[in-house]
């Protein structure tokens, strides 16, 4: 379905990608959304989620709509906690709001060293691909190539920095519960990284949340199921504009 152009120039849409993701993550969704003002941000140049939040808030417009995927959702949640008056709508996709378990820190940093030694694409396919997408998409070579290409374009330094952002994050559930803007939670039913339970933890505390589970989706639902994601995002954007 082709939508008419949606004028959101007063509330531009800001899209934050996840670990080893760039604008390619959002392209299928953007093509279907047809909105006037949208920007895609690759998370770099910060050593923690709070630092990433501060740096983005320094350069973004006074008011905007914010959507984040995975690590991008963690940073988006931090931004909404830091400046709720500026975030006029929030969408979190494939998010785990909980702090990182201390016993996983060493393995996360070791993953960066292994990826550097083996090459990002080879490491990703052997270590992460099985958990990235729904079982029905594991043989989808185009999808795999897209995700690997993003990783290679981001590079190992970006991966190392994003790993530190993910490690150094806060539990912002209390701040999330206090948000009054239109809020959307999207998750894949078959996501083993950011599970449906993680999204239930967030949805339970905020009466303004709309939650949708993509039954056929894994972790990478913006790429796996853009036809299902885009209408939900467009409806959310429309609601934000009308508020």
Which residues fall in each region the model found?
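Gly/Ala-rich beta-loop-alpha elbow adjacent to hydrolase catalytic centers
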Residues: 68-72, 76
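Short alpha-helix in the alpha/beta-hydrolase fold that links the catalytic acid
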Residues: 181, 195-204
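Conserved HGGG/HGGXW glycine-rich cap/lid loop of the alpha/beta-hydrolase fold
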Residues: 2-55
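Catalytic histidine-centered segment of alpha/beta-hydrolase-like enzymes
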Residues: 217-230
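Flexible "cap/lid" loop of the alpha/beta hydrolase fold
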Residues: 81-82, 86-121
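Conserved alpha/beta-hydrolase catalytic His-Asp/Glu region
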Residues: 100-103, 120-177
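Catalytic histidine neighborhood in serine/cysteine hydrolases
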Residues: 204-219
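Short beta-strand/loop motif that positions the catalytic acidic residue
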Residues: 179, 185-187, 191
């Amino acid at each position: 379905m082709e939508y008419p152009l949606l004028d959101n120039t007063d509330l531009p849409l800001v899209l934050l990608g996840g670990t080893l993701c760039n604008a390619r993550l959002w392209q299928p969704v953007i093509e279907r959304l047809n909105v006037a003002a949208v920007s895609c941000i690759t998370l770099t140049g910060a050593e923690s989620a709070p630092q990433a939040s501060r740096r983005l808030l320094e350069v973004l417009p006074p008011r905007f709509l914010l959507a984040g995927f995975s690590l991008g959702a963690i940073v988006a949640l931090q931004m909404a906690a830091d400046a709720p008056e500026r975030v006029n709508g929030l969408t979190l996709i494939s998010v785990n709001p909980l702090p990182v378990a201390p016993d996983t820190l060493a393995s996360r940093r070791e993953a960066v060293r292994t990826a550097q030694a083996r090459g990002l694409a080879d490491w990703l396919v052997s270590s992460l691909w099985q958990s990235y997408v729904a079982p029905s998409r594991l043989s989808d070579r185009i999808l795999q190539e897209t995700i690997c290409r993003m990783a290679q374009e981001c590079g190992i330094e970006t991966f190392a920095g994003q790993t530190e952002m993910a490690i150094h994050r806060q539990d912002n559930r209390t701040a999330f519960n206090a948000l009054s803007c239109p809020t959307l939670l999207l998750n894949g039913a078959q996501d083993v990284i950011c599970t449906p339970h993680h999204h239930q933890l967030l949805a339970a505390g905020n009466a303004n949340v709309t939650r949708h589970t993509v039954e056929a989706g894994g972790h990478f639902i913006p790429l796996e199921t853009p036809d299902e994601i885009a209408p939900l995002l467009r409806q959310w954007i429309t609601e934000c504009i009308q508020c």
